[in-house]
Swiss-Prot record:
It comes from Buchnera aphidicola subsp. Baizongia pistaciae (strain Bp). GO terms for cellular component: bacterial-type flagellum basal body, rod. Belongs to the flagella basal body rod proteins family. The basal body constitutes a major portion of the flagellar organelle and consists of a number of rings mounted on a central rod. In Gram-negative bacteria, at least four rings, L, P, S and M are present, whereas Gram-positive bacteria lack the L and P rings. The rod consists of about 26 subunits of FlgG in the distal portion, and FlgB, FlgC and FlgF build up the proximal portion of the rod with about 6 subunits each. The keyword Oxidoreductase does not apply. One of its GO terms (biological process) is bacterial-type flagellum-dependent cell motility. It is found in: Bacterial flagellum basal body. This is Flagellar basal body rod protein FlgB. It comes from the Bacteria.
Length: 136
């Protein structure tokens, strides 16, 4: 029974991790807005999510390399840097020092944060529903 509950939350774990990863990239863009030569980057969210989700469905895990059976692997952790889909965006406005459109990156940062928060609320509601069912 716990396996079914765990599998049900797997997609949510993937989504939250991917939103958090994208948030780091967007924050880096904003922080480096005045850094000469810095290029704006982002991930192809749907492509990366598709890869992670299909790997999860196929049971593929992103394990650490272990040289002994006594070593601990990270088979439950999603290593997003393995799916580094960073691409340089083509911005219509580029400052003289770098290729960052700060307004677009700020909007994407807020939008991604809202999606992350919505996913957290959804997960909390799932937990509440499960607890209500278990209580009877």
């Amino acid at each position: 029974m716990l396996d079914k509950i765990n599998n049900d939350f797997n997609i949510n774990k993937i989504l939250l991790n991917l939103h958090a990863y994208r948030q780091e990239i967007l924050a880096s863009n904003i922080a480096n807005a005045n850094t000469p030569g810095h290029k704006s980057s982002d991930i192809n969210f749907s492509k990366t999510f598709g890869k992670l989700f299909s790997n999860a469905l196929q049971g593929k895990k992103n394990n650490l390399t272990t040289t002994s059976n006594k070593h601990i692997s990270n088979n439950d952790n999603v290593e997003l840097s393995n799916y580094d889909e960073q691409t340089v965006k083509n911005n219509s406005y580029v400052s003289k020092n770098n290729a960052i459109n700060i307004d677009v990156d700020r909007i994407n940062f807020v939008h991604n944060g809202l999606k992350y928060n919505a996913d957290v609320v959804f997960i909390n509601n799932k937990f509440k529903n499960i607890m209500n069912v278990l209580k009877g």
